[in-house]
């Protein structure tokens, strides 16, 4: 797919602490069976791993739409993201400061905020929210899991279109775009070892913004060890402040006038 990159994004500001690990590439096996467990909220369910309680977000399916609701995570819990989890129109997910979410390698995990859905991820300088690989430190590699995707209803020059990377989700407002659309808050968030290539030229990036509106708050983001672009924008009117990237394998940032 031939695209025209029109903007090299703003200078990086290394405000969040970067993770240190090996940064060699690695293959990704196909999806495995979902874990057994009891759903707690329709989105999260718990399971014992040895003496630890682990809370799974999603069931490992490539298309797991969370039942409609407002989901609030707990920073004291151990979370694993499994499969492609969709926060649909009318639903929200709130992630408190200090929460760590580990992406499952086997199911190529990704969190997708669809049009009308919202994420409220408010970290702090001392307690950032971290999305990272579930692999043990020293074994983590770029592309261990998918990444974070936000889809909105703001303007682009192609109307409604499917987001890059393979998920079912569409972005853009068609003939009635909403440039003030609000997909929530990303503040003091770190994403590590993401960037799974679903197909050639259809990669899931560290963080992808599809027609995200100006009502969305985005600041103090860091993507490290991404296998594809650290950040990618497709149209939209969102303003992003203080973004940084380290140890990348593809482009730092891409923005397309779409």
Residue spans for each PLM region:
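Feature marks extracellular polysaccharide-active and adherence modules
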Residues: 96, 102-104, 114, 122, ...
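Conserved small/polar residues in nucleotide/adenosyl-binding loops
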Residues: 246-253
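Coil residues (strongly favoring Ser/Thr
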Residues: 52-53, 60-62, 180, 220
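Extracellular beta-strand-rich solenoid/capping regions of secreted or surface-exposed proteins
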Residues: 66-68, 82-94, 105-123, 137-156, ...
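All-beta strand scaffolds that present successive hydrophobic residues in beta-strands
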Residues: 73, 93-95, 119-123, 186-189, ...
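Bacterial Sec-dependent N-terminal signal peptides
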Residues: 3, 8, 13-49
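Extracellular beta-strand-rich, repetitive "passenger/adhesive" scaffolds
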Residues: 73-80, 95-100, 117-131
């Amino acid at each position: 797919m031939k695209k025209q990159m029109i903007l090299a994004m703003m200078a990086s500001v290394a405000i969040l602490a970067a993770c240190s690990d090996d940064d060699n590439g690695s293959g990704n096996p196909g999806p495995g069976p979902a874990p057994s467990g009891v759903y707690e909220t329709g989105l999260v369910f718990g399971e014992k791993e040895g003496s630890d309680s682990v809370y799974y977000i999603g069931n490992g399916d490539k298309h797991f739409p969370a039942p409609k609701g407002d989901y609030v995570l707990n920073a004291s819990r151990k979370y694993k993201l499994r499969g492609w989890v969709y926060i649909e129109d009318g639903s929200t997910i709130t992630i408190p400061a200090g929460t760590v979410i580990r992406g499952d390698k086997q199911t190529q995990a990704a969190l997708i905020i669809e049009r009308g859905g919202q994420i409220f991820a408010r970290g702090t300088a001392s307690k950032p929210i971290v999305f990272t690989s579930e692999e043990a430190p020293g074994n983590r590699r770029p592309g261990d899991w998918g990444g974070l995707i936000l889809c909105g209803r703001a303007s682009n020059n192609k109307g409604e279109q499917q987001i890059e990377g393979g998920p079912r989700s569409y972005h853009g407002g068609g003939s009635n775009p909403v440039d003030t659309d609000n997909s929530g808050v990303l503040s003091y968030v770190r994403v590590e070892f993401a960037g799974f290539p679903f197909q050639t030229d259809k990669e899931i990036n560290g963080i992808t913004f599809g027609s995200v509106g100006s009502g969305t708050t985005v600041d103090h983001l860091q993507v490290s060890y991404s296998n594809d672009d650290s950040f990618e924008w497709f149209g939209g009117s969102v303003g992003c402040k203080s973004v940084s990237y380290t140890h990348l394998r593809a482009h730092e940032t891409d923005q397309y006038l779409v």
